């Protein structure tokens, strides 16, 4: 269903990525001062990953693991979707923990773990793919870079003492 939507609307993935790149550091700077909220939103951002990668499907797995190394382009909608999938959780975890490198490693290792589960659990109806790991890892790098920018901005322009952040 999601692949069909993305193929029908090829502009969707680039727009979402642009929103994340432009809005991520701004939202991250705001969340820097609200780590509890950042952790809550981080937990919510894991839901699409679980639903799209670990929920069983009815399809039959024809091959256990596919080995391919294609870089994402705007024309390859599924690859772009895999990139986008990992940007928010890594961004949010990095801002909440104030450790972009740790969040980046978590995203890369988490993606590898998902692919391992898919490879070892044929009953899921999903097959592992090295390209999924690659594109998820690219998304994790983007998320960590955006978090670094947000953390830098929050430290460079700290909120004023005595303000609640509400207007």
Predicted regions and their residues:
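Loop-to-transmembrane alpha-helix initiation sites
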Residues: 128-133
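Bulky hydrophobic segments
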Residues: 1-126, 145-167
């Amino acid at each position: 269903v999601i692949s069909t939507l993305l193929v029908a609307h090829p502009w969707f993935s680039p727009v979402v990525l642009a929103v994340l790149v432009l809005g991520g550091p701004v939202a991250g700077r705001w969340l820097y001062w609200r780590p509890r909220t950042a952790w809550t939103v981080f937990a919510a951002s894991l839901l699409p990953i679980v639903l799209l990668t670990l929920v069983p499907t009815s399809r039959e797995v024809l091959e256990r693991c596919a080995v391919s190394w294609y870089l994402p382009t705007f024309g390859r909608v599924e690859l772009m979707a895999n990139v986008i999938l990992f940007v928010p959780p890594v961004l949010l975890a990095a801002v909440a923990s104030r450790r972009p490198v740790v969040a980046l490693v978590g995203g890369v290792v988490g993606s590898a773990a998902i692919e391992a589960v898919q490879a070892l659990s044929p009953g899921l109806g999903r097959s592992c793919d090295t390209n999924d790991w690659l594109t998820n890892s690219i998304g994790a790098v983007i998320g960590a870079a955006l978090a670094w920018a947000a953390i830098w901005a929050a430290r460079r322009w700290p909120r004023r003492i005595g303000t609640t952040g509400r207007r």
